[in-house]
Amino acid sequence: LSGRVDDILLLPVSITFDQLHEVSEYAEYARGGSKKPEGFGWLYGFIKAQGSQHYGKVYVRFGEPVSLSSFLGPVGGSVALDPAARRLALQKTAFEVAWRINQGMPVTATALVTTVLLAMQGAALTFAQVRLGLADGMDYLESRSVPRTASARALTGAGAVRATLDALVAGGVVTAVGDGRDPVWLIGPEHQLAATFYRNSLIHFLLDTALCELAVLRAGESASDAGSASDAGSASDTGSVPDPVGAFWDEIARLRDLLKFEFYFQERDEHRRQVAAEMARHDPSWESRLRSGPAAADELLAGMRPLVSHVVVRPFVEAYRLVADVLAHDDTVTSDSDVVREALGLGRQYVAQRRLRSSESVSALLFQTALQLARNRGLFEGDDLAARRAAFLAELRDLVRRLDRIEDLAIRRYIRDAVGAMPAD
């Protein structure tokens, strides 16, 4: 046909802000508030408010183009003529574009500093402690050639860290307490959801290493369980011993399935190669170390820097656990709005009781994704609903337990590093 186009290139575009004035609206919506309709009036108000004070820079980045024909095939080909194959190809195309947008999105100074402060779950840090908390993360991003803004690269200097803290204080996200012996900075519970807007712009760069940490811990525990079973005589009954490396990959697959509605993953084989490369960067002999027993697995985990799974994965897992708790408590509930309402109330209760480490998990946005996952797993229909909902809750509780272990390890390391960095008397 005359004028026919054989291919279309989709250009991934990422837009990142140092700060946005509307993060408070984002937080209110996450708490269960209503979302304002977006039209020309909203756009005018957005531009006017964004220009009302200095919120920093806007970063526009263009990724590697995606060829539509590489997924859909030639015009009139088998994929184009098969509705099911065409639908799947379009889904894969969308995921590839989204993944490339994420890969091209630069990490900002705002994102790095809020990530460090959110990891403290409301506890304050001195200026020196903020800089110490930034060090490992910045080294990691540098070693992986992750794109960063000039402001993020400048965080090796004290002046850039101070400027970022001051900007976040002015933006109402960070609180400064300066009337004591040492000034300190924190993100209080009332601002944690707003701060996640910035933190979430970088966590996809940390996702694979976060999954690796949890999988290493699971592999070590499987080896320990196998050893206990062998001591009890049950291993000889079955004649088989679980392979820790197999347990590692099983856990990667399970976590990928758990988080598939939150993150854009590459195709399974490609993602497996990415995970293997990530582990090799931490330790080229990681497989043999996993097979050396639980103690070696613990040493492997302890040597991974930085430890990030409690920062990257915990907010999602704890939000899912709240929804699972609601579903397990009442196996007759089926309305999404009822589940979200009950989960919001339960989350606020658990925060007050300190059964949740942070209020950022109490988010209607995360609860909606949790409901997607629950429906995907058939937890709103079928037989044995109560038992399957209880099993889902138990799975998430066990994952939270392992996140607690990694967080405790990260805190002990941070304290050790902080003591080592103190000047001698």
What kind of feature is each model-predicted range?
Residues 1-425:
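Membrane-interfacial terminal anchoring regions of lipid-handling membrane enzymes
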